[in-house]
A protein has these predicted regions:
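Histidine-anchored nucleotide/phosphate-binding helix
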Residues: 37-58, 140-147
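A short, charged/proline- and glycine-enriched loop
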Residues: 21-32, 122-125
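Conserved N-terminal structural segment that caps and organizes enzyme catalytic cores in eukaryotes
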Residues: 3-4, 38, 162
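Cysteine-centered metal-binding/redox modules
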Residues: 7, 133-144, 151, 155-605
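Acidic/Gly/His-enriched mid-domain segments of enzyme catalytic cores or analogous surface patches
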Residues: 63-126, 139
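Structural motif
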Residues: 33-39, 60-64, 129-134
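Short N-terminal or domain-adjacent regulatory/targeting segments
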Residues: 1-25, 105-113
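Short internal beta-strands
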Residues: 55-66, 82-83, 152-156
Length: 605
C-alpha cells in the first residue's frame, strides 16, 4: 500500500469475507465512515469509541486519524477502527468494500448499477459522519454515499440542502451516534455488564503483548479449563459467584498462572447437548472484554489480562460477571439459573481438571463420534447469511457443518430450540432419492422454500451434481483439478496461487453469491476430514492439493478418516502443497511419485 502507517488504504477481499459472518450475525451491526477533523480531538475520540463500544466497524478518513493518534487511541482492524487515509479521496476504499460486498455475497453482476445500489441500500448498513467544513470534493463523496443508500450526518450548517433520512444536519457532535443509528435504522443490542472496562465485539481481535500483560493463564503450561455443567434447578443459586484461590491482585506481575471456570446452568429446557455450544461461546465472550485476550478451548485455553485493564479494577468476579450475563442473555430460552465458580488454586485446578473436566470432554467426544448423518432423525437449515446472499441455504448435518465453519449440527439444533422461528429450521430426511449423492425430496423442498424458489435441488455429498450453494463466508473452496483427476482445496488465509490457476479470491468470485457451481464448492475446514466429503465422487482420496498450513491443521483427523475408509497410512503425505507445486504439471509428477490414489479413480467429468 502507498499509504503511511497507520493508514491501510485498500482492504483485501479476504478482509471483507472475514467481516461477512460478524455482519450477518449482527456482531458488527453497522459500518461508520468518519470524514474530516472533529471540532476537538476529545470529541473525535469520544465518537469513535462510542461506535466501537457498540461493535460498529469504524473507518477513518482525513484529520480525524491524527486526532485519534494524538490521543493515543489503539487503532487497527483487530479492534475494528481502520484508518484508511489522510486525503478525502481515501474514502474510495470503503466505497470499494460496499461494492465488492455486493459482488462477493450478493452475486450482483459487475456493471449492473441498478441492482448494485439496491443491494448496498438494503444490505450494507453503512453511514457517513462528515465534519465541517465541507468542500466540493467532500460534498461529491457524500452524494455518492447517498446514492448507495448511506445517510450522511454533518455539523456543517452553511449552504447545506437538507434531505430527510439522507443528508442530515446535526450541530451537536455528541449526538452524531444516535442520529446516525436512527437514520440507518441500526438496532444495537446492549448487554449491560457491570465491569470496570468496556465490553464490545470490537475488542474481539485485540492482541495483548507480553510487555503489556499483567497476568497470563496458560493451559499449555498449567492446569486450566473451562466447563459448562448442567444441573437440576434446585442445585443452582442464580448469579452466585465463588472464587477458590487467589484473585488477580495476589498474582505476580507477568506470571503464568492456572485458572478454571465452571459454569453451572439449570433450566426446564436445558439439554446436555447444549453444553459444548455454550463453551464455544466463551472464546467470544472473554475476547470482547477490553484488554483481555482468549485463545483455545476446553483444557487448552490461554488468557491474558492487560496491565491497563487490571489497573482499571478488573478481577476474577468481573470475568464471572461476563460469563453469567452473556449466558443469561443469549440462552435465556433454556437457562433459568446460572452460577459461576472460578478456581485459581493450583492443586484444586489439577484435581478438577482430571476428575471433572477431562471425563466430561471424553463423554462428549463419544457422543459426537456417534452422531452421524444416518443416526439423527433430522437435519437443519441455516440461512443466517441470507442477509448478504439472499438465495443461499446451508443444510447442516452431523457430518457436514456450515460452510462458515461456525455452525455445527448441535449449534443448529440449539439455535432452533432457542429461536424456533429463527435461521435454523428443522429439515426432515424421510424421503431418500439417492443415498450416495445425499439427495432427499424433503431437503429439496426445504431449500426451494428457504431460497424462495432460487434453488430446486441440492445434494449433500457431491461436488458435481447440484452441489450446495456458497455465500461468501466460506472457510475453504474445493475445485476440480483435471490433470490429476482430483480436487484442490484452498483456504481464505492462503493468498498464493493454486494448481487450478486461480487464487482463493478468484475461485471465490466463481463460487459465492448463493449460486450452484458444479465442480466447485465452499465448505468449512472440519468438513475436509468428514467421511461424507465428496462421498459421491469417491471421498477424501480425491484430495490432491491444499496449502501447507491448512494441511497441518486437518492432518490428524484426515489421516484417521483415510485409514478407516481406504486403509491408507499418513494420507496427507501424499497431498501436495505450495512447497511442492503450484502448477498442475509439477503437482502431477509429485502425485505419481507418491502413488496418490486419485490417479487410479474414475474420471470426474
Amino acid at each position: 500500500t502507498p499509504y503511511e502507517e497507520p493508514c491501510s488504504g485498500h482492504l483485501m477481499d479476504a478482509t471483507i469475507r472475514e467481516l461477512g459472518v460478524p455482519l450477518v450475525t449482527g456482531d458488527i451491526p453497522g459500518v461508520a465512515v468518519i470524514l474530516g477533523a472533529a471540532p476537538t480531538k476529545e470529541e473525535a475520540v469520544e465518537l469513535v469509541k462510542s461506535y466501537q463500544a457498540q461493535g460498529i466497524l469504524v473507518t477513518l478518513v482525513g484529520g480525524v486519524i491524527d486526532q485519534c493518534l494524538e490521543a493515543g487511541l489503539n487503532m487497527g482492524a483487530a479492534v475494528r477502527i481502520i484508518p484508511l487515509g489522510r486525503d478525502v479521496t481515501s474514502v474510495i476504499h470503503v466505497v470499494s468494500v460496499a461494492i465488492r460486498a455486493a459482488l462477493i455475497f450478493g452475486n450482483v453482476t459487475p456493471g449492473d448499477a441498478g441492482n448494485l445500489m439496491k443491494y448496498t441500500f438494503e444490505r450494507v448498513p453503512a453511514f457517513v459522519n462528515a465534519f465541517a467544513p465541507l468542500d466540493d470534493v467532500i460534498v461529491a463523496c457524500g452524494a455518492g454515499a447517498i446514492a448507495l443508500g448511506f445517510p450522511v450526518i454533518t455539523n456543517e450548517t452553511e449552504n447545506i440542502f437538507r434531505v430527510p433520512k439522507s443528508l442530515i444536519v446535526q450541530e451537536d457532535v455528541s449526538k452524531f451516534n444516535a442520529t446516525s443509528l436512527e437514520a440507518r435504522d441500526i438496532k444495537i443490542k446492549i448487554t449491560k455488564i457491570d465491569i470496570p472496562v468496556s465490553f464490545a465485539s470490537a475488542f474481539e481481535g485485540e492482541i495483548i503483548r507480553r510487555g503489556d500483560m499483567q497476568v497470563e493463564f496458560d493451559g499449555s503450561r498449567k492446569d486450566c479449563f473451562e466447563l459448562v455443567c448442567t444441573k437440576e434447578l434446585t442445585e443452582v443459586e442464580d448469579h452466585k459467584f465463588t472464587l477458590i484461590g487467589p484473585d488477580f491482585d495476589q498474582m505476580e506481575v507477568g506470571s503464568k498462572q492456572q485458572i478454571a471456570y465452571i459454569v453451572d446452568v439449570a433450566g426446564k429446557n436445558m439439554q446436555t447437548d447444549f453444553e459444548p455450544v455454550f463453551e464455544r461461546k466463551f472464546h467470544s465472550y472473554v475476547n470482547c472484554i477490553e484488554g483481555v485476550m482468549h485463545t483455545g478451548q476446553r483444557d487448552m485455553i490461554r488468557i491474558r489480562v492487560s496491565k491497563n485493564t487490571y489497573e482499571a479494577g478488573f478481577r476474577a468476579k468481573d470475568l464471572a460477571e461476563v460469563l453469567y450475563a452473556n449466558i443469561k442473555n443469549e440462552f435465556d430460552a433454556v437457562v433459568d439459573k446460572c452460577a459461576v465458580t472460578i478456581v485459581t488454586d493450583a492443586e484444586e485446578c489439577t484435581k478438577l481438571r482430571h476428575e471433572l473436566a477431562v471425563p466430561a470432554y471424553d463423554r462428549r467426544d463419544e457422543r459426537l463420534t456417534s452422531l452421524t448423518d444416518e443416526s439423527v432423525p433430522v437435519y437443519y437449515s441455516c440461512i443466517m447469511c441470507q442477509a448478504f446472499s439472499p438465495s443461499h441455504v446451508c443444510v447442516v448435518t452431523p457430518e457436514r457443518l456450515g460452510l462458515c465453519g461456525a455452525v455445527s449440527w448441535l449449534d443448529a439444533k440449539a439455535t432452533n430450540e432457542l429461536d424456533p422461528e429463527g435461521p435454523c429450521q428443522v429439515i426432515t430426511k424421510e424421503r431418500v432419492i439417492d443415498e450416495n449423492l445425499g439427495r432427499y425430496e424433503d431437503v429439496d423442498e426445504a431449500v426451494a422454500k428457504f431460497s424462495r424458489g432460487a434453488l430446486e435441488h441440492v445434494t449433500l455429498y457431491s461436488i458435481m451434481e447440484d452441489p450446495m450453494t456458497s455465500c461468501g463466508c466460506f472457510e475453504c473452496i474445493c475445485g476440480i483439478e483435471p490433470f490429476s483427476n482430483g480436487v484442490a482445496i484452498t483456504n481464505r488465509e492462503y493468498t498464493g496461487m493454486t494448481p487450478l490457476g486461480m487464487t482463493f479470491g478468484e475461485l471465490a468470485s466463481m463460487t459465492g453469491g448463493g449460486v450452484q457451481t458444479p465442480g466447485f464448492m465452499g465448505h468449512g475446514k472440519h468438513f475436509i476430514s468428514s467421511k461424507k466429503f465428496m462421498k459421491a465422487e469417491g471421498g477424501v482420496e480425491r484430495i490432491v492439493w491444499m496449502p501447507k498450513d491448512l494441511k497441518d491443521q486437518v492432518a490428524e483427523r484426515l489421516n484417521k478418516t483415510a485409514k478407516e475408509l481406504y486403509d491408507i497410512d499418513n494420507f496427507t503425505d501424499m497431498i501436495g502443497d505450495e512447497t511442492v507445486a503450484t502448477d498442475p504439471e509439477t503437482l502431477l509428477e509429485f502425485l505419481t511419485e507418491k502413488g496418490h490414489p486419485a490417479l487410479g479413480l474414475e474420471p470426474m467429468m
